[in-house]
Regions:
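Glycine-rich ThDP/TPP pyrophosphate-binding loop and its adjacent helix/strand module
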Residues: 1-166
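Thiamine diphosphate
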Residues: 1-18, 83, 166-304
Length: 304
């Protein structure tokens, strides 16, 4: 929505990717299936999952309760799928991420085969490394295994420290570059910049609550969902980043913004979001939307 509303030729302000690191347990959850199905349908090419595929849960191996072909499952959702055979192969993971970023029409799943408890001589690839601390003696063995002083804690090697400091400097420079671009954008598109700054600050336009409908008490009264729908439509034109919908219940919960189109793979400026019958994903997606400055998400369903 931000990109569709504010990006202009030569000013690609909003083009970031969203990453999720997913465990075997995350992949099993029903909400994961709902969200992944919808993301594939909407062709959200900016979404990248890194799947920590270690085959271990708290109770033991995933084969106790799970034997799905996750890669094929996500392909059926319309995702771009890659596999990295070794979770310690940084170059292979980097290449997979770069490939995923080139994919514009499909979200990406990168299945990375990892070893839980890697470096622990007695607990690697076991459930013991999942839900409990390694313990002092095992931790000492891990340090020795990696060539660290076993008597020291919170060890950060010099080359690691240098690497992160370089990344920090690179990030600072990218931030400066973005703000330089934004200052130029502000000169060329002052109205759009002013609107974005207001909404991203958490403030609302001064006139947002002008001419709101008034509901008088009566014998019959009005269902709260009907009143809510009228209120949403009354403020929608004044709040351009108000976006939401329902889990296939818009006619009943009155969440449709009648003056605006639906959000779709072809129209990211649409403001009516069709979640399908995916209530769990709807809740998670709305929370994710709320993390983006400026966007005001809403949703509705029946509670029984």
């Amino acid at each position: 929505s931000l990109a569709a509303r504010y990006n202009k030729p030569g000013f690609n302000l909003f083009d970031y990717h969203i990453y999720a690191i997913c465990s075997d347990g995350d992949i099993m959850e029903g909400v994961a299936s709902e969200a992944a199905s919808l993301a594939g349908y909407l062709q959200l090419g900016q979404l990248i999952y890194l799947y920590d595929n270690n085959h271990i849960t708290i109770e033991g191996e995933t084969s106790l309760a799970f034997n799905e072909d996750v890669a094929e499952r996500f392909k059926s959702y319309g995702w771009h799928v890659q596999a990295v055979a070794d979770g310690n192969d940084i170059e292979a993971i980097t290449t997979a991420i770069e490939n995923a970023k080139k994919e514009k029409q499909r979200p990406s799943l990168i299945s990375v085969r990892t070893q839980i408890g890697y470096g622990s001589p007695n607990k690697v690839n076991t459930a013991a490394a999942h839900g409990a601390p390694l313990g002092k003696e095992e931790l000492r063995l891990v340090k020795e295994n990696f060539g660290f002083d076993p008597d020291k804690s919170f060890i950060v090697a010099d080359d690691v420290l240098r690497f992160y400091r370089e990344k920090g400097k690179a990030g600072i420079q990218k931030e400066k570059d973005w703000y330089a671009l934004y200052r130029e954008y502000k000169q060329n598109y002052p109205a759009e910049a002013a609107e974005y700054e207001l909404l991203s600050s958490g403030k609302l336009p001064k006139e947002w609550n002008n001419n709101l409908p008034v509901f008088k008490p009566g014998e019959k009264g009005m269902a709260t969902r009907k009143a809510s729908g009228k209120m949403l439509n009354a403020i929608a034109d004044k709040l351009p980043l108000l976006i939401g919908g329902s889990a296939d219940l818009a006619p009943s919960t009155d969440t449709n913004l009648s003056a605006f189109p639906s959000f779709s793979s072809e129209n990211h400026s649409g403001r009516n979001f069709h979640f399908g019958i995916r209530e769990h994903a709807m809740g998670a997606i709305l929370n994710g939307m709320a993390l983006t400055k400026g966007i005001i998400p809403y949703g509705a369903t029946f509670l029984i």
